[in-house]
Regions:
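Conserved Rossmann-like nucleotide-cofactor binding loop
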Residues: 11, 34, 258
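Short loop/edge segments at beta-strand edges and connector loops
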Residues: 7, 79-81, 223-225, 231, ...
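Mid-domain catalytic core of redox enzymes
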Residues: 22, 228-349, 362, 442-450
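Conserved flavin/dinucleotide-binding core of flavoenzymes
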Residues: 98, 316-450
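Active-site/ligand-binding neighborhood in enzyme catalytic cores
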Residues: 124-230, 234-236
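Dinucleotide-binding Rossmann-like beta1-alpha1 core, especially the glycine-rich loop
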Residues: 45-132, 137-140
């Protein structure tokens, strides 16, 4: 079978990789001149700057880990201990480790009564039915009952647990008020906190897509080739891209949902394209403040997170600690990641100024940076508000035969959600009956090498 995959981010690359393992002929179309999407790296003056995704998350990324092991790349991942400072409103700082949720309980700002309340809440969640996979949209939908994360957190962890754990933690990951979010993901993370372990590929998260493409022999990769149209053609489809028409038997559509809606407009009902276009996205910005000589070589913490949303920014991250190869020898870069609500009133110049002020607040005086690099996306991260998972998951049954969707937006913005979705789309295409759980090793064992 000849299959077109539209979109060269992690979802599309994972779909192409899986389809080739199954013996299909695959054409992968990517509008940019490289694969990776929002995981891509930008190389500038000796720095390798991430355009979006920052890290992988250990045991809660089972499909990413499994594929990297198949590719022989898993052992190349570099552990990141992510020592974290929580900044209180009055300037006091408390230390924790981002990948060890229970380490937040050591913060002295939490009373013994508060710590017991949080520990009891976590213990209850461990024995309460909940999602076992953090990035399976169908499973998350089963535990999305309409409550939002703020009310859930205050009920389960209490006021201080919400202020000093949930707000900084989820503020870093998704940069929006926790009242905007369904609690299903955080519920899943709390249930699996012991499996968290942060890692980074040596060349940055964008290297995951490079590894997938390199590990997909026979892939027909078409870079700088945006797809203009998908039309029915007999028992298959014609994909129009780069001024050429490509007849295929099936299509996996893996760009962001607004682009997917445009491509599917003549193939599906208006209700389906509306669901795609209504998928909530955040205004997203981060600034890399780059120094060729590190002004703070003795600063220990990798991450600084505010314990409230009173600042414009939600995280500062030292690049030399997260990805040592990404800075020139003796250099440093600070990634300043912004909350979504303030961006509505901020120009790009305002964002850069606020980033420089954040660097001063967190790390202290420094000479002028050698350069700053702003990444600003009006449609940045997909936001899973209450009801999101069920609405998006229902789309799979609404696609015509031979058309499959993939993307992290079915769960939450993130590499695992994208890879899970891309692999699942390929398995759906390959199976006349509902596919086996894509986490199952049987899927890999049964795969036919091309």
């Amino acid at each position: 079978m000849k299959v077109a995959v539209v979109g060269g981010g992690p979802a599309g690359c994972a779909a192409a990789y899986t389809l080739r393992k199954q013996g299909h002929e695959v054409v992968l179309f990517e509008a940019q001149d490289h694969v990776g999407g929002r995981t891509s790296q930008v190389l500038k003056e000796g720095f390798s700057l991430g355009s979006g995704a920052l890290f992988l998350m250990g045991g809660i990324y089972p499909r990413t880990n499994a594929i990297l092991k198949e590719l022989g790349c898993y052992r190349e991942l570099i552990p990141w201990d992510a020592e974290t400072e929580i900044l209180d409103a009055d300037g006091r700082r408390y230390t924790a480790k981002f990948d060890q949720v229970m380490s937040f309980l050591r913060m002295p700002v939490l009373s013994w009564r508060g710590k017991l309340r949080i520990a009891a809440g976590v213990a209850r969640e461990l024995v309460t039915p909940g999602p076992k996979l953090c990035f399976d949209g169908a499973e998350l939908a089963r535990f999305d009952d309409g409550e939002n994360l703020e009310t859930w957190s205050r009920r389960v962890l209490g006021e201080r647990g919400t202020t000093y754990i949930t707000v900084p933690y989820m503020g870093f990951l998704y940069a929006v008020p926790i009242s905007w979010l369904s609690p299903a993901l955080f519920h899943a993370v709390v249930k699996q906190f012991y499996r968290l372990a942060l890692t980074v590929p040596p060349k940055g998260v964008g290297q995951v897509c490079d590894w997938l493409v390199e590990g997909t022999p026979g892939l027909d990769l078409r870079l700088s080739t945006p797809v203009d149209k998908i039309t029915p053609d007999g028992a298959g489809f014609t994909v129009t891209a780069g001024g050429e028409r490509h007849p295929v038997d099936a299509v996996i559509v893996a760009p962001e949902p607004g682009v997917a809606a445009d491509l599917l407009e003549d193939l599906v009902e208006p209700e389906s394209t509306k669901k795609l276009r209504d998928c909530m996205y955040s205004d997203y910005a981060h600034v890399q403040v780059c120094f060729k000589r590190n002004p703070w070589p003795k600063h220990r913490a990798s991450v600084a997170l505010p314990a409230n949303m009173e600042r414009d920014w939600g995280a500062c991250v030292l690049l030399s600690k997260r990805q040592p190869s990404a800075v020139p020898e003796g250099g440093e870069a600070v990634g300043v990641y912004f909350y979504t609500p303030p961006l509505e009133r901020m120009s790009d110049a305002d964002i850069i100024k606020s980033a420089l002020n954040a660097v001063l607040e967190v790390y202290g005086p420094a000479p002028d940076p050698d350069f700053v690099e702003l990444f600003h996306y009006r449609r940045g991260l997909s936001i899973a508000n209450p009801g999101h998972y069920g609405t998006l998951d229902s789309l799979h049954a609404e696609m015509p035969p031979g058309v499959y969707l993939a993307g992290d937006y079915f769960a939450h913005a993130g590499v695992e959600a994208a890879i899970f979705s891309g692999e699942l789309a390929a398995n759906r295409l390959n199976a006349p009956t509902p596919p086996a759980d894509p986490q199952s090793p049987a899927d890999t064992a049964a795969a036919v090498k091309p």
